[in-house]
Amino acid sequence: MGELFRSEEMTLAQLFLQSEAAYCCVSELGELGKVQFRDLNPDVNVFQRKFVNEVRRCEEMDRKLRFVEKEIRKANIPIMDTGENPEVPFPRDMIDLEANFEKIENELKEINTNQEALKRNFLELTELKFILRKTQQFFDEAELHHQQMADPDLLEESSSLLEPNEMGRGAPLRLGFVAGVINRERIPTFERMLWRVCRGNVFLRQAEIENPLEDPVTGDYVHKSVFIIFFQGDQLKNRVKKICEGFRASLYPCPETPQERKEMASGVNTRIDDLQMVLNQTEDHRQRVLQAAAKNIRVWFIKVRKMKAIYHTLNLCNIDVTQKCLIAEVWCPVTDLDSIQFALRRGTEHSGSTVPSILNRMQTNQTPPTYNKTNKFTHGFQNIVDAYGIGTYREINPAPYTVITFPFLFAVMFGDFGHGILMTLFAVWMVLRESRILSQKHENEMFSMVFSGRYIILLMGLFSIYTGLIYNDCFSKSLNIFGSSWSVRPMFTQGNWTEETLLGSSVLQLNPAIPGVFGGPYPFGIDPIWNIATNKLTFLNSFKMKMSVILGIIHMLFGVSLSLFNHIYFKKPLNIYFGFIPEIIFMSSLFGYLVILIFYKWTAYDAHSSRNAPSLLIHFINMFLFSYPESGNAMLYSGQKGIQCFLIVVAMLCVPWMLLFKPLILRHQYLRKKHLGTLNFGGIRVGNGPTEEDAEIIQHDQLSTHSEDAEEFDFGDTMVHQAIHTIEYCLGCISNTASYLRLWALSLAHAQLSEVLWTMVIHIGLHVRSLAGGLGLFFIFAAFATLTVAILLIMEGLSAFLHALRLHWVEFQNKFYTGTGFKFLPFSFEHIREGKFDE
């Protein structure tokens, strides 16, 4: 099996990096993205590592850049993204970057502070302008109110606002007032509070400000209203001011005479004009600063986060006692060792160091990470497999087979020619525009997820077209491409049909045994005549049910066969002789035999003998019961009873074959090894004497948690494990075969939903023969298209997708795929280059 079908061969290597070259070497390795660093300081606190100060400086620069980015986005300035991949700055360049970011941050903060103060002043002047504009009307109304209060007829009603001695003298009444501005939504509550606290002894007038005013702190526009409150006495004045303060109303001085108000308004307008000019200049300066930053901020982000990633990686390394060398351990693919060596040489040259960096391969029994190379086409399918579990190192990778089997099984459930075309067109659109979509960096998580599976959707659509043609199903209707192979005419000429037969029967059955009625199989797929047959569902159910069983058993047998390649590669002959062979015999003797029976029945019985065809279900049940009644179900072939009894006995013998032999042989081997004293020690291979290379290797003691240390053999545990595996496999063969019937069930459900949608929606519009019907068809078709996309494409498509996922994860992969590995996570700048800064 080639590398396509297995994970890459990995090796553990030791890097010796000179202190002055370590930064540049790690930078080159990050650009290459082919090595995974191991933490050699697991017991050291992150705040006590050597490069923690550099990491903090990078985080501080990152914070400043995020502040600048926030200001840029707030100003709606587009951030330029040229796709440039800047080189990592040298450590000495960090000071210049820090100074630059500090300058930009301080400048923006100063501008924001000044702008906020100016806007607050501008808001106050604007509110004062509206107060002066509205007060004349308020004062006129107050004067009228005052005259009414002085009227003897109204004297008793207004007594609460008049002092007793003034009432006696009839002296003129002087009212105090306050004017201000308040948020419009607070006016009703404000008015009720004034009325209750002041007991109705105040006169409130308010008017809305037509244009919303900008809040200097938040930048939001707020609707406000001008108010003026008339009262008498200092006690009411204090109450009114406290209420205004509680409602966060802004109070402003307002002259009493019209002349003074006019002069003040003139001065306010002049100050507003001057302030507006200063505000415009401040905003222009802020825009220039932000636009200049927007051109470079993406590059700055990449530089800073590359530096941070490098220093974080350097913190994983050990430092020798001389402080002149950093020691790192990395997992890397064997095929990429040359490119890694070249990257180290390049990094050493960039740093100006004269001492080369050294890469030394190490021998270890630790389990390496699993690394499957993918491209943009296979990446989605590999993600489907990895979602179940990361493959064990070097075991068979299901992804290459999933590329075909997953969309095919999806299409078996989804098969519809029309729906397949719609799905394919959507996928083709995403594939053709993938460069533009990738450059736009969509933040919509749902669309990003769909886009990442564009090639999966493309194949699902293409296979749906294929299965739709086989089912001859296009939006629940059949396509009569080649003409039906069935003919009615021979039923009149050679059969016993007459005109009276047609008139007297609502349903008639064509007899394929009569020559000429059935002209042979349809060239491709199902004959379109079945679309109008009353027994269409009976025929399709039988066909799809048997097809589901056949596909399921073939799929599972293929999975069991793949386990053979794992056993051969890992040199486990016991698993072949006492695992693979009995498993394949068990499944083939029972369910493989069922597939043979299905094909045999299809070929052995024709139109003349189909009435005598026995039931496969009854035969299969009788096979397990060893029951063969002479009356009822006839035998399919001669010698059937003996063959079926033989197959059952063989299948039953496979159970102890799988259950007992392997644990007993392992126990015998263990006792023999124990007797000879040839057990392995530790996790590192030990020979007669360490070579020079081995002596260097044994110095490191940071063993991974994934190491496969030799353990004491426990016969009981082995026996229990083998019993669980045997029971799971034997019962799984039955349950998994039944599970594949979901192919039939979902295909039936999809076809029926499609037919219901056609009958209940589009059929109505097509049967109205008038101008109104033509106009109505436009809206009916819109509803039909919407329901087709929402229900049949999205909901049914998602359902079929999940069921296909289940069939691969459980029914297929559990035959050969353990999925207990851990993923290869190389140190790479790729996610930084793509703008995924938060990862």
Curated annotation (Swiss-Prot):
Residues 415-416, 479-542, 602-646, 752-772 are vacuolar. It is found in: Cytoplasmic vesicle, Clathrin-coated vesicle membrane; Cytoplasmic vesicle, Secretory vesicle, Synaptic vesicle membrane; Melanosome. GO terms for cellular component: clathrin-coated vesicle membrane; cytoplasm; cytosol; Golgi apparatus; melanosome; nuclear speck; perinuclear region of cytoplasm; plasma membrane. Keywords: Cytoplasmic vesicle, Hydrogen ion transport, Ion transport, Membrane, Phosphoprotein, Synapse, Transmembrane, Transmembrane helix, Transport. The modification Phosphothreonine is found at T257, T367. One of its GO terms (molecular function) is proton-transporting ATPase activity, rotational mechanism. The keyword Phosphoprotein applies. The chain crosses the membrane at residues 396-414, 417-433, 449-478, 543-562, 581-601, 647-666, 727-751, 773-811. Predominantly expressed in neurons in the cortex and in the dentate gyrus, CA1 and CA3 regions of the hippocampus (at protein level). Expressed at lower levels in astrocytes, oligodendrocytes and microglia (at protein level). In the cerebellum, present in Purkinje and granule cells (at protein level). V-ATPase is a heteromultimeric enzyme made up of two complexes: the ATP-hydrolytic V1 complex and the proton translocation V0 complex. The V1 complex consists of three catalytic AB heterodimers that form a heterohexamer, three peripheral stalks each consisting of EG heterodimers, one central rotor including subunits D and F, and the regulatory subunits C and H. The proton translocation complex V0 consists of the proton transport subunit a, a ring of proteolipid subunits c9c'', rotary subunit d, subunits e and f, and the accessory subunits ATP6AP1/Ac45 and ATP6AP2/PRR. Interacts with SPAAR. This is V-type proton ATPase 116 kDa subunit a 1. It comes from Mus musculus. The gene is Atp6v0a1.
